[in-house]
Swiss-Prot record:
This protein binds to the 23S rRNA, and is important in its secondary structure. It is located near the subunit interface in the base of the L7/L12 stalk, and near the tRNA binding site of the peptidyltransferase center. InterPro entries: Ribosomal_uL6-like, Ribosomal_uL6-like_a/b-dom_sf, Ribosomal_uL6_a/b-dom, Ribosomal_uL6_bac-type, Ribosomal_uL6_CS. This is Large ribosomal subunit protein uL6. Belongs to the universal ribosomal protein uL6 family. It comes from Frankia casuarinae (strain DSM 45818 / CECT 9043 / HFP020203 / CcI3). GO terms for molecular function: rRNA binding; structural constituent of ribosome. Part of the 50S ribosomal subunit. HAMAP family: Ribosomal_uL6_B (MF_01365_B). PANTHER family: 60S/50S RIBOSOMAL PROTEIN L6/L9 (PTHR11655), LARGE RIBOSOMAL SUBUNIT PROTEIN UL6M (PTHR11655:SF14).
């Protein structure tokens, strides 16, 4: 039995969960998320908790058991507390500014780089070199953050670029002069 999949998912008050066939819909104070559960896995509600079970011990069932439990747990956390990722910009002249609900970056290119906020994502600019990506879908928050980081990855020689808060950038030693 999967150690993670075996754990029940506590459902806080204010969260409404409906299971219709293979689709799980989670409604909470911050919004609504839904997920289609893969074939062999079954999700049941039982006195204020969700239980994820598998019918057999086939390899596919075992691998999907813990995954499904974690995805549903992330949905419950997302609609109650939400997710956020803080990113920092390091470099002379590198900055970010809010343009309505979107962001505009100056990252050393000859043009500003606009980033539109997808549905369900909210940007918060704290300083010109620090901003936060907020949302209820953990996967979408991570994906948008990774795309923004990919606009100018941290340089291993000078450390310039967009990085996650607390990310350690391994630095290389430059060439030695003669």
């Amino acid at each position: 039995m999967s150690r993670i999949g075996r754990l029940p998912i506590p459902v806080p008050s204010g969260v409404d969960i409906t299971v219709e066939g293979a689709t799980i819909t989670v409604k909470g104070p911050k919004g609504t998320l839904s997920h289609v559960v893969a074939e062999p896995i079954v999700v049941n509600t039982e006195d204020g908790r969700l239980l994820v079970t598998r019918p057999d011990d086939e390899r596919r069932s075992r691998s999907l058991h813990g995954l499904t439990r974690t995805l549903v747990s992330n949905m419950v956390t997302g609609v109650t507390a939400g997710y956020s990722k803080t990113l920092e910009i390091v470099g002379v002249g590198y900055r970010v500014q809010a343009k309505g609900s979107d962001l505009e970056f100056a990252l050393g290119y000859s043009h500003p780089v606009p980033v539109k906020a997808p549905e369900g994502i909210r940007f918060e600019v704290q300083t010109p070199t620090r901003f936060v990506v907020h949302g209820i879908d953990k996967q979408l928050v991570g994906e948008v953050s990774a795309k923004i980081r990919g606009l100018r990855k941290p340089d291993p020689y000078k450390g310039k670029g967009v990085r996650y808060q607390g990310e350690v950038v391994r630095r290389k030693v430059g060439k030695t002069g003669k």
